[in-house]
Amino acid sequence: MKEHELGKARRIAELAAMHRRGQDIIGRLPVEDIRIQYHEDLSPLGWHLGHCAFIETYWLREIVLGDNATTATLHGVYFPDLCEKAARPEFVLGRDQLLEWTGAVHSENLALLADPPAHMRQHRLMRADYLLDFLVQHYAQHLEIMHYVLAQRELRISGPWTPGRTLTPANPLGEALRLPRQPVMIGCDAPCAYDNEQPRHAFRRRGKYIAQYPVTNAEYLAFMENDGYRHRELWSRVGWAWLDNTRVDCPALWRRAEHSWYELSAAGPRDLKPDAAVRGVCFYEAEAFSRWAGARLPHEFEWEAAARAGLLQGLGQVWEWCANRFHPYPGFRPFPYEGYSTPWFDDRHGVLRGGSEHTLPPVRRTSFRNFYTLDKRHICAGLRLAWD
Ligand code: AVJ
Ligand code: FE
């Protein structure tokens, strides 16, 4: 077997593993729960699995092979811009039917990928197994989002719980790392990288320091107990308006117990570890916290420069809000479709770097840019401080 073939076998196995994870999540839930919309920004769990199977089939059959027999009637259900979130529950198949349908189209797709006809191999999307990487990463991102849905479901169904430990506040340590002085290359040219990670370009530091660790639960509690949610001067104008509207006073999954706090997760209630990264805060809260701590959020390039120098610790617990908006790199070219990144370069989306406990290896890389609007709290997001 040639090296290239080995790569392909591994990628096919990865795709199959992603699909199995999705099936497992659906398979162990009560029948009714897969069609519930638990949060206005999230889709029903059943929709996610159907969408992943649809997207896989759409790219392989409709785009590469020009055969729309399976997908033609499903565009209005599974293309996000053709079916608003609130309408999705009514389209979710019954659990067994969903498992059977997604299982069947997925097996057919795997067989096609394992032994593609000659004209399929020539397609530009098949070069360097691009489409396989793309589909694996697509599944990986939806699987993470399915965990956000599971956490919202816990918020809905779980009763009172007694934490095993008391969370006590701690002042932010502010252990700072010096950002590299010399220019650092930002982005990734690997074939698997998304359009928004390219092209690579040099960045020279502006600020000087970035925190070694993300902000912790204990530090965030200090902000709360110091009336961080009530001090207007810590908030930007839009941030304050957002707060006034939502009346938020703690991270999204935190719950108050008699003498302390705990948090809900995709796997149920759990203690808030004092040194674990705080999760479930939006950009505005991250911004207010950093002002309270006498710091600021890092620009995404500061974050990436520090991550490339191997400096950052505590990675992979939460997505970390960056100071800047999501924007195209100089020389950006959209691929494999206009809609992946371009619509979100709208000055309303912030950038998140790093990755959470639910982020799977195919999308865990230093150059990966996640993006959400500034008010989102259902994602597993926290922050890391920076200083000039
Ligand atoms: C990059 C996570 C914001 O969920 O909308 C999934 C990823 N794009 N299917 C999203 C995505 C198309 C995207 N995020
Ligand atoms: Fe998608």
PLM-predicted stretches and their roles:
Residues 2-13, 17-29, 33-37, 41-45, ...:
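Extended beta-strand/loop cores of jelly-roll/beta-sandwich
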Residues 62, 310-311, 331:
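Single-residue recognition of alpha-helix boundary sites
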Residues 189, 302-303, 321-326:
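Histidine- and/or cysteine-centered catalytic micro-motif in compact active-site loops
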Residues 300-305, 367:
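Short, structured beta-strand/loop micro-motifs enriched in basic residues and often containing a Trp
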Residues 306-315:
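Cytochrome P450 C-terminal beta-domain/meander region
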